[in-house]
């Protein structure tokens, strides 16, 4: 894996020197991340329809790669599930599942891919993104089979996120899980925004907000 990352870093360095590949790197930097944050979870860069996309890997419950979540680089927030002709089932997979520690009995759930990267950057590795606001029955069953006992809901600080957190709290408790809801304070919308407020001491800030 280390050898693979080294080769990818060299390749991305060459890309970065080319003007047309600077935009994705600048986009990552503005969101508080660096190249290694992307590469460490099997991320990459893709071109589709002459547009640049950041790719993150989707794995099924057997840790098999089944596709990619692609985020469009730019101001417009747009996502695609790849391959387009046979998109992976969101209800039967998780973004970055392969990188979830197996020895944990607690899982942190966030809404988006960049929220997930922010948690990992802060040292909270037992985290998964919903890539939305719902959790499927198959995903909950996977948690039960994986001996997950406690779920910490860390959704966005907006109306939709608060409603979803309340719904998920009820559903998860009915399924037998211990549930904790962590709500962001003030006008901070999500965990990626919080990262941008505390770039130099992010690990401490994240743990403080999670009351760890």
UniProtKB/Swiss-Prot annotation:
SUPFAM superfamilies: DNA primase core (SSF56731). SMART domains: TOPRIM. GO terms for cellular component: cytoplasm. Residues 105-187 form the Toprim domain. PROSITE patterns: TOPRIM. GO terms for biological process: DNA replication, synthesis of primer. NCBIfam families: MG010. PANTHER family: DNA PRIMASE. This is Uncharacterized protein MG010 homolog. It comes from Mycoplasma pneumoniae (strain ATCC 29342 / M129 / Subtype 1) (Mycoplasmoides pneumoniae).
């Amino acid at each position: 894996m280390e050898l693979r990352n080294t080769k990818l870093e060299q390749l991305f360095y060459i890309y970065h020197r080319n003007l047309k590949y600077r935009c994705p790197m600048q986009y990552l930097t503005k969101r508080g991340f660096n190249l290694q944050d992307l590469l460490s979870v099997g991320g990459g860069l893709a071109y589709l329809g002459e547009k640049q996309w950041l790719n993150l890997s989707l794995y099924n419950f057997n840790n098999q790669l089944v596709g990619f979540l692609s985020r469009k680089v730019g101001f417009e927030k747009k996502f695609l599930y790849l391959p387009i002709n046979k998109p992976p089932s969101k209800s039967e997979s998780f973004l970055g599942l392969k990188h979830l520690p197996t020895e944990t009995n607690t899982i942190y759930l966030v809404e988006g891919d960049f929220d997930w990267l922010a948690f990992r950057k802060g040292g909270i590795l037992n985290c998964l993104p919903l890539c939305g606001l719902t959790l499927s029955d198959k995903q909950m069953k996977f948690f039960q089979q994986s001996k997950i006992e406690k779920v910490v809901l860390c959704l966005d600080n907006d109306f939709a996120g608060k409603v979803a957190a309340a719904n998920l709290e009820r559903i998860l408790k009915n399924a037998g899980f211990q549930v904790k809801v962590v709500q962001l304070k003030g006008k901070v919308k999500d965990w990626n925004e919080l990262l941008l407020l505390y770039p130099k001491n992010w690990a401490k800030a994240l743990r403080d907000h999670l009351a760890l």
